[in-house]
A protein has these predicted regions:
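A short, glycine-/small-residue-rich helix N-cap motif at loop->alpha-helix starts
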Residues: 14, 68-81, 101-102
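N-proximal low-complexity "stem/linker" segments adjacent to membrane-targeting elements
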Residues: 1-21
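Active-site nucleotide-sugar/metal-binding loop of Leloir-type enzymes
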Residues: 80-90
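Conserved catalytic core of nucleotide-sugar-dependent glycosyltransferases
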Residues: 106-194
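C-terminal catalytic/acceptor-binding lobe
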Residues: 178, 184, 188-284
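Short beta-strand-to-loop acidic/aromatic patch adjacent to the donor-nucleotide binding site
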Residues: 88-99
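Short beta-strand/loop segment that forms part of the nucleotide-sugar
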Residues: 29-41
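Short, acidic, metal-binding catalytic loop of nucleotide-sugar glycosyltransferases
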Residues: 20-30
Length: 284
């Protein structure tokens, strides 16, 4: 199993969707810990509801239990390091806007990939299909993708990330959108960086990488699955019959507290072309 941390702040309903998707498509690959932060008692109520739901469900369905940890430190990385103090050899980071929409390769194949290649990360959000970088900028529409690399174990693409444009999808080894790391590498990176707000994780860690803070410690190669299996969905577009709540995090949490959950089966994952989507979320 892969030691896996899901980072969440004020999004218990979206977290529920991710956990459901992992249980549907993750098999027994991920050993889950949720690191959550609630800015109010009402959001905390949402997290308690999610915890109770999955605790009951896991006993019934014989899923591995999910551990829950509330954020304590002003530096997010300190909390991550505490959780990962007794981690397994491989570590995966998700956040509460992710959805795992396809099955992932077996642990045996992923471990073999890391054993036979020196890599910074295996990305589950990238693949041959993620050709778009930014759909709202004509000059930055298409992703800077690897022009050369390897195809290993019939499932993984491997390339030199240092040859990719900085701060673009295929040039960013450090992400909480379904990236898998060797435990020693990610722990070293977390120790050398400070992240106060999860939304700045990619920017702060990548900034350290490009400044040379991890000089000589980060392999230039990274990898991805042949086709992406994870997306980040904003849930800014909502469709339901409840007219009294808006699409803000507060409104979404109100729906969740009242017993409505985001319907995983309402999403169409057949034409994914970028790691970030803006699908309409349907509540049921």
């Amino acid at each position: 199993m892969i030691s896996t941390v899901v980072i969440s702040r004020d999004r218990p309903a979206q977290l529920h969707l991710l956990l459901e998707s992992i249980q549907r498509n993750g098999g027994n690959l991920f050993h889950l810990t949720v690191l959550f932060e609630a800015s109010s008692e009402y959001f905390l109520e949402g997290y308690i509801k999610a915890q109770q739901f999955f605790s009951k469900k896991n006993r019934k369905d014989f899923n591995f239990p999910i551990r829950w940890k509330q954020r304590e430190s002003s530096n997010l990385n300190e909390d991550l390091l505490k959780i990962l103090s007794n981690s397994r050899e491989l570590v995966c980071l998700f956040n509460d806007q992710n959805i795992l929409f396809e099955r992932v390769s077996s642990y045996k194949k992923i471990k073999k990939l890391f054993s036979t290649h020196s890599m910074s990360a295996l990305s589950l959000r990238l693949g041959n299909n993620t050709v778009i970088q930014n759909p709202y900028e004509s000059g930055n529409y298409l992703a800077d993708r690897p022009k050369e690399g390897e195809f290993d174990l019939d499932r993984f693409l491997i390339w030199d990330a240092t040859k990719i444009k900085s701060y673009t999808n295929f040039g960013m080894p450090f992400s909480t959108n379904g990236h898998i790391y060797h435990e020693n590498l990610i722990k070293n990176v977390l120790k050398r960086t400070k992240v106060e707000d999860h939304d700045n994780f990619e920017l702060e860690v990548q900034k350290g990488l490009y400044k040379g803070s991890f000089s000589g410690k980060i392999p230039p190669s990274m990898a991805c699955t042949e086709y992406s299996v994870v997306i980040c969905n904003s849930c800014e577009r909502i469709s339901d019959s409840i007219g009294k709540y808006d699409n803000t995090e507060i409104g979404i949490n109100h729906r969740y507290i009242e017993g409505n959950i985001i319907d995983y089966d309402s999403f169409d994952f057949s034409n994914i072309s970028k790691p970030y989507e803006d699908f309409t979320a349907f509540f049921k």
